[in-house]
């Protein structure tokens, strides 16, 4: 029974590989976002204990590291929708499934690390707002710069998924050229 599962989803089709890639991107992005929010919220809690009136200004800075989890989810849904995971015909060959596994891992790692870095940058911005509340608008710019690379990873994952699942994609056999 297990052998049949492996054969159907990993050998005959690449659906299992693609599903693993989709889940890994969600896992990495979700863990990174949770850690990033923890860093920012911990810093904000200290500030709010003395200046509770800053809650509205600090809320955005606390929430910013959570966007990577959403970007990972979008990447996973995109993989799932292009491979037959969400219904329809399974059209992904094993080699494309493996490639999508690496797309998911790549996006997931960038989302994971950028969420943590964004949490650290948000914590620094929270300290700025604590000392100079009128600088809240400028303080948001610092963690938003880290966000740029999370968006780049999402766009790269979407483009790679589109290219890899293009039905007109043909794979050349380099061994046949020398024969």
Over which residues does each language-model region extend?
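Hydrophobic, small-residue-rich transmembrane alpha-helices and their short perimembrane loops
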Residues: 1-179
């Amino acid at each position: 029974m297990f052998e049949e599962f492996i054969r159907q989803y990993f050998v005959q089709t690449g659906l299992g590989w693609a599903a693993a890639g989709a889940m890994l991107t969600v896992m990495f992005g979700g863990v990174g976002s949770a850690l990033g929010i923890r860093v920012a919220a911990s810093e904000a809690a200290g500030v709010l204990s003395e200046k509770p009136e800053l809650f509205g200004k600090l809320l955005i800075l606390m929430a910013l590291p959570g966007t990577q989890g959403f970007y990972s989810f979008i990447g996973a849904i995109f993989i799932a929708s292009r491979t037959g995971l969400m219904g329809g015909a399974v059209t992904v060959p094993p080699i494309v499934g493996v490639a999508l596994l690496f797309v998911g891992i790549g996006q997931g790692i960038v989302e994971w690390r950028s969420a943590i870095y964004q949490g650290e940058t948000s914590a620094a911005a929270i300290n700025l707002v604590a000392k100079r509340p009128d600088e809240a608008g400028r303080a948001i710019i610092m963690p938003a710069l880290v966000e740029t690379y999370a968006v780049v990873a999402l766009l790269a994952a979407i483009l790679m998924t589109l290219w890899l699942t293009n039905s007109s994609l043909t794979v050349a056999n380099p061994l046949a050229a020398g024969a």
